[in-house]
């Protein structure tokens, strides 16, 4: 396989060299156009070849399932010492790294390369991997995952979505993956931090319903194939592995797909999530594995994804509140800070009330899920509240800053755009 790839790369380079050296390009005044086209084409082609060479070979491991939290008899909002330390570390990272990178990342619509090294240093993926595979997860840590998402999102919503994409896929594979899926992918995630993964869930459909999918899965001689289109895929252009939602046997299901030549990838910048490099993916009879088996619960899968977006919305709303408090205390009008005006003070007070309400619902749903109890109702209510109130907080943040809030001089307009994803996206992450 490696020899074949090397030959393909060699042939491609020789062909590009011959075309670029042709005098005909100068005569027809096409050199600049052709060179640009060759650059883009070769860049995409070699990216696909490089990804194809990444080997995912099954290893002999036992099927992993993390036990539910056994001591969850009461809903307790107090954090454990470990959770508090994790929140402090993630909040510090969000403030010192994510916040400083966010403006340029959004402006250039590009996920910063240096963040991958930071992710390795944080060891975030090991929070999702079971102890048997070298990770630190000994039981369901859904509440801790929610707290991590909230803490990171205080720095930036889009960058957090990118950082948590592989982490979320590992969570999903650990919780739902069949023996075949786990043996093929989890050891690779444990050993190689350069392997990345994401979710291809959203479809180009008005009022998208995750239980009514246009993407289809078919089975032929025990092999699954995916056909359809997905949009707003976080880091879709660089991921090695995708978790794809598709209809199979008349029901929605989740499949594992490796990046290959049957997937057409197109950059698709959106109103928000610019730093997450969202893309549209077209699957054309793409080989796939079914994620779960007998214990897979599609509804719970969707709910756990929605809770992560809610947690990120809470973190970003906290950032808006803190920024507005600082601005309102420093900005003077008519000889006094604008925070002395009740219209401004009440808006900030409402932010605090709504953030606490959102956090309460999200943690309640996560706590039930962690204990292995039904949590669909609570997750649904949490998403409804977060979708509505996060946009209100984003709007009020822009309003408090007035004309400044509408400019890129301040981050509130970016937070406002990113928060819109809370109401639009389903799944795409996993607690």
Q: Where is each model-derived feature located?
A:
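Glycine-rich phosphate/cofactor-binding loops in nucleotide/flavin-utilizing enzymes
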Residues: 1-65, 148, 168, 401-431
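Internal helix-loop-helix
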Residues: 56-63, 91, 121-193, 235-238, ...
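Short, contiguous pre-domain boundary segments
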Residues: 63-79
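Glycine-rich beta->alpha junctions and the first turn(s) of the following alpha-helix
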Residues: 79, 154, 265-356, 422
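C-terminal helix-coil-helix/basic helical segment that borders enzyme active sites and/or dimer interfaces
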Residues: 102-107, 333-336, 352-385, 398-403
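A short core secondary-structure module
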Residues: 227-264
């Amino acid at each position: 396989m490696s020899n074949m790839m090397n030959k393909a790369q060699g042939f491609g380079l020789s062909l590009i060299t011959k075309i670029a050296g042709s005098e005909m390009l100068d005569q027809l005044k096409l050199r600049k156009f052709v060179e640009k086209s060759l650059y883009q084409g070769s860049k995409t082609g070699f990216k696909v070849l490089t990804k194809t060479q990444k080997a995912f070979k099954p290893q002999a491991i036992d099927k992993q399932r993390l036990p539910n939290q056994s001591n969850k008899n009461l809903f307790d909002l107090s954090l454990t010492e470990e959770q508090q330390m994790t929140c402090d570390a993630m909040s510090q990272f969000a403030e010192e790294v994510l916040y400083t990178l966010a403006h340029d990342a959004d402006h250039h619509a590009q996920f910063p390369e240096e963040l991958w090294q930071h992710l390795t240093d944080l060891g975030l993926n090991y929070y999702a991997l079971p102890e048997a595979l070298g990770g630190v997860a000994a039981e369901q840590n859904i509440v801790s995952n929610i707290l991590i998402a909230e803490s990171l999102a205080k720095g930036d919503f889009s960058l957090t979505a990118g950082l948590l994409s592989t982490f979320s896929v590992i969570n999903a594979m650990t919780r739902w993956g069949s023996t075949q899926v786990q043996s093929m992918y989890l050891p690779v995630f444990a050993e190689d931090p350069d392997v990345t993964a994401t979710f291809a869930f959203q479809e180009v459909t008005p009022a998208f319903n995750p239980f009514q999918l246009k993407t289809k899965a078919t089975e032929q001689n025990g092999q699954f194939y995916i056909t359809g289109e997905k949009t707003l895929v976080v880091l879709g252009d660089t991921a090695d592995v995708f978790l794809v939602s598709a209809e199979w046997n008349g029901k929605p299901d989740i499949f594992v797909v490796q990046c290959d030549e049957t997937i057409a990838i197109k950059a698709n910048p959106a109103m928000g999530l610019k730093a997450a490099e969202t893309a549209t993916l077209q699957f054309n009879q793409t080989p796939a594995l079914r994620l779960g088996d007998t214990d897979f619960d599609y509804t719970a899968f969707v709910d756990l994804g929605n809770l992560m977006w809610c947690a990120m919305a809470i973190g970003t709303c906290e950032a808006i509140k803190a920024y507005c408090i600082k601005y309102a205390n420093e900005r003077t009008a008519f000889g006094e800070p604008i925070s002395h005006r009740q219209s401004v003070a009440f808006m900030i007070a409402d932010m605090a009330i709504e953030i606490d309400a959102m956090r309460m619902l999200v943690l309640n749903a996560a706590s039930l899920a962690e204990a292995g109890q039904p949590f669909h109702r609570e997750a649904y209510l949490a998403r409804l509240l977060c979708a509505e109130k996060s946009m209100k907080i984003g709007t009020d943040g822009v309003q408090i800053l007035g004309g400044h809030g509408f400019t890129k001089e301040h981050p509130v307009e970016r937070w406002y755009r990113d928060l819109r994803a809370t109401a639009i996206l389903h799944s795409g992450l996993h607690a």
